[in-house]
Each structure stands twice: as structure tokens, then as C-alpha cells.
């Protein structure tokens, strides 16, 4: 097996857990650079599996499938944050270079862990999360401070694109919402006086090289990304610098290798709060395929292959419209 510091050369197999649209875009980027791709996804007709050199159709924690993937691939990554962390652990135990590792991904898989991480490293990152409280027992609802209302109740796991969250204005609404979520562990987050939302896309290599794309300003409709504008038109240069430095601090503190996106809220007061971490190429970064020297997907390939990261230079101002199929509206 090659040394963990050696570059992985074109012609080698790179693996991706997850066969959706992000995996498909990653596959095209890897193939354009001369790599082969193995996709593990349970869907026979997965978008990435359809274009990859090899598609292993199996559950993400299928031991035989993971062993087969490990025998083929020099490095493996994940397409989305809800791939079980144990799959990444098992692949690493089988001797495969995994980027990012489960330790970084698992923080973003659980909103409780994510909020704790962001709060713990607030001083280092310079930006922390919104005021919040973990809801795990009936007594937690009783002891919610009044100033957390109105708030947004979010399930700790499996929430994305506006799913797994609801706005609550009173303790009674909170109790009812928690019942509808089947009393799973949740986070109640104070609803902030939001001015606009931005995302910071950063990439870290195995050698601790970190590069950042220009901060993007996002508009969501029904919890789903609608448009992304780059450069972000509403932030000051001081705010952008603070956001980029926070994202760089977060990716280093997670010891994370690969592409990572941090979403931030800019409040009407001018304050900034960290909303969430996405441990993968991000929808708001799709514009990089046409507007930057190096796309976010090529950067993911470079990080996995342990080769130098590319330039994040923006070659033209961009407004991206996120169009999705009717089945997902």
C-alpha cells in the first residue's frame, strides 16, 4: 500500500459513498483528471452509479460491500453527511485513506454535537452559534428560558433542506412540535433577526493547506436553496474576512480533509452567527464549476488524492439559480 503522504496518481480508483447528484458531479471531475470512480449506493439507478466505472449496489454498512470497496479504492469520501460514520471507520480500518474521517463528519451529522462544537470553539473561530437548548426530556421544555421564543425546533439528526424543523412561539407549541417529532432529541434554537444568509466554502489538504472560495450570499425558498450570488453583495469586507477566518478555524479544528461548507447568518444588528456545517461539496458551491479556476469537486478530488489544492479565484461574478425536479419541490 502506498505511503499515506504519497500522492494518489491518475488511473487509480477513488471511492464515493453516496450516488446522488453531488456524487455524479464528483465522478465527472475525477474522471476528467484521469481517475476512476467506484460508487457505493443502495439505489440501482443512482445518478453517480450510472456514470462511474464501478457501482456497488449495497447498504452503506454492508461489510462485504465495504470490503470490496476497500480492495478497489485508494481513497474514499462521502457524498452527503448522513452516510453512517461507522462506514467511514470500517473503511479506514481496512486500510483505505478516508477523507474526511468519521470524526469530522459525525459532528455535522448531529445538531447537538454541532452546536456544542461551535460553542466550544467560539473564541477561536470568532463566531459562535445562535442561543439554543437541547430538548431531550419533558423537564427541558419546562426550563426553556422565555427569551428563546420564538424559536426553531430542529431534530438532532437527519435534517436538511428545511426538513426536521418547525418554528414555535410558545412552550405549548414547543411541546406539541416535540410530540410530532416523536420525542427524539432536538435542539431549540432562538429565531434570530436575520438580514441575510451566506456560506463559506473552504478546502483543507492532508498537509494542512487551507484555501477558501469567495463568500456566497444565498436565498432560500421553502427551506431549499434558490439563488446564490458571488461575490456576496450585502457583506462588508470586514464581515467577509471574519467569516472566512472562522470557516478556516473550523475546518482545522475538525482536522477535516476535503471540501467543507459553513453556513452563517448575518443579523440586522451586523452580528454574525454560525448556522450549520456541511461536510461535503455544497449546493451553494455549484457555481464554482463555471465561475472559478478550480471547482469544488476538483478540489475534493485533489484533497483525496493528496495533491496540491487548486486556485479558488473567481473569474467572473455569478448568480446561480438552483433548479430541482418536481419530485423534490
Task: Please annotate each region the language model reported.
Residues 1-116, 120-121:
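ATP-binding N-terminal substructure of ATP-dependent carboxylate-amine bond-forming enzymes
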Residues 64-65, 87, 139-143, 173:
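Short acidic active-site motifs
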Residues 102-165, 171:
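A conserved helix-loop-beta module that forms one wall/lid of the active-site cleft
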Residues 164-262, 266-268:
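Internal nucleotide-binding/catalytic subdomain
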Residues 241-262, 268, 278-326:
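Active-site "cap" helix and flanking loop/linker of ATP-utilizing ligase/carboxylase catalytic domains
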Residues 270-273:
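Conserved protein kinase catalytic/activation segment
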Amino acid at each position: 500500500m502506498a505511503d499515506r503522504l504519497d500522492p494518489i496518481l491518475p488511473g487509480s480508483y477513488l471511492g464515493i459513498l453516496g450516488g446522488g447528484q453531488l456524487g455524479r458531479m464528483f465522478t465527472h471531475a475525477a474522471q476528467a483528471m484521469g481517475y476512476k470512480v467506484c460508487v457505493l449506493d443502495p439505489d440501482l439507478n443512482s445518478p453517480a452509479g450510472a456514470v462511474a466505472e464501478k457501482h456497488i449496489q449495497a447498504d452503506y454498512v454492508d461489510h462485504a460491500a465495504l470490503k470490496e470497496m476497500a480492495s478497489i479504492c485508494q481513497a474514499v469520501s462521502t457524498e452527503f453527511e448522513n452516510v453512517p460514520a461507522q462506514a467511514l471507520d470500517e473503511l479506514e480500518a481496512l486500510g483505505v485513506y478516508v477523507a474526511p474521517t468519521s470524526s469530522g463528519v459525525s459532528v455535522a451529522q448531529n445538531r447537538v454535537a454541532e452546536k456544542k462544537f461551535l460553542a466550544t470553539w467560539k473564541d477561536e473561530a470568532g463566531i459562535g452559534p445562535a442561543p439554543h437548548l437541547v430538548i431531550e426530556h419533558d423537564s427541558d421544555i419546562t426550563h426553556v428560558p422565555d427569551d428563546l421564543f420564538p424559536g426553531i425546533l430542529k431534530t438532532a439528526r437527519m435534517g436538511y433542506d428545511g426538513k426536521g424543523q418547525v418554528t414555535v412561539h410558545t412552550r405549548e407549541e414547543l411541546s406539541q412540535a416535540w410530540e410530532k417529532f416523536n420525542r427524539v432529541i432536538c435542539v431549540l434554537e432562538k429565531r434570530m433577526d436575520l438580514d441575510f444568509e451566506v456560506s463559506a466554502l473552504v478546502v483543507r489538504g492532508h498537509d494542512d493547506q487551507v484555501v477558501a472560495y469567495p463568500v456566497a450570499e444565498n436565498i432560500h425558498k421553502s427551506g431549499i436553496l434558490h439563488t446564490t450570488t458571488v461575490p456576496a453583495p450585502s457583506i462588508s469586507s470586514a464581515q467577509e474576512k471574519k467569516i472566512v477566518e472562522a470557516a478556516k478555524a473550523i475546518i482545522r479544528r475538525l482536522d477535516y480533509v476535503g471540501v467543507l461548507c459553513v453556513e452563517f447568518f448575518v443579523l440586522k444588528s451586523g452580528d454574525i452567527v454560525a448556522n450549520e456545517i456541511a461536510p461535503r461539496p455544497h449546493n451553494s458551491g455549484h457555481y464554482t464549476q463555471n465561475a472559478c479556476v478550480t471547482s469544488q469537486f476538483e478540489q475534493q478530488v485533489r484533497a483525496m488524492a493528496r495533491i496540491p489544492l487548486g486556485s479558488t479565484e473567481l473569474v467572473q461574478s455569478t448568480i446561480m439559480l438552483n433548479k430541482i425536479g418536481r419530485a423534490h419541490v
